[in-house]
A protein has these predicted regions:
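Alpha-helical scaffold segments
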Residues: 1-178
């Protein structure tokens, strides 16, 4: 813990408190993730993920790793860069004992690859859309600027709420375009 915090330049966390209290550790991990994601270099990411994943409470470590995945996905230049970055982390992620935690992180990576491919110009099919989580479908419904993607979500979204968000956003985008 001390090395992880020092490596991120965080010196105001009591290491003994962090070791003893999962809430203090979780907060410290969030800060480490922020520093790590804001760095231009990705060279230390695997070692940082490995250190976080040694936490005795997998839910705490999983949450921190997911936060890093989310931040890096929003920072990369495209799906190829994210695919390469995430592939370097998968051996560490696969060390998690709980299969549900491993699967959750793998699904999140898949979701972001899907999102980034759309941002890169790919128009997904209904079958591809069905393979991403409800969370990612909602992110797309709330953030996509593509009328074609919004129409797909309106027609094929997995939940009524997703379909309604997409339908309403597509309608308002059409009005603004007129």
């Amino acid at each position: 813990m001390a090395d992880l915090l020092a490596g991120a330049g965080i010196f105001d966390v009591d290491v003994d408190d962090a070791v003893a209290d999962e809430h203090v550790r979780s907060s410290a991990y969030r800060r480490v993730v922020l520093v790590t994601a804001s760095s231009r270099s990705r060279g230390r990411d695997r070692a940082i993920v490995a250190a976080i994943l040694r936490d005795p409470i997998e839910m705490v470590s999983k949450s921190a790793v997911v936060a890093l995945v989310d931040r890096i996905a929003m920072k990369v230049t495209g799906p190829a860069e994210f695919r390469q970055w995430s592939a370097e982390l998968l051996p560490e992620i696969d060390q998690l004992k709980a299969e549900r935690h491993r699967e959750f992180i793998h699904r999140r990576v898949h979701d972001w690859l899907f999102y980034l491919s759309i941002e890169d110009g790919h128009m997904p099919t209904p079958v591809e859309l069905a393979k991403v989580t409800d969370w990612m479908q909602r992110v797309l419904a709330e953030e996509s600027t593509s009328l074609a993607v919004l129409a797909l979500l309106d027609e094929s979204g997995s939940r009524k709420k997703i379909r309604n968000i997409a339908k309403n956003r597509a309608g308002s985008r059409k009005l603004r375009a007129q």
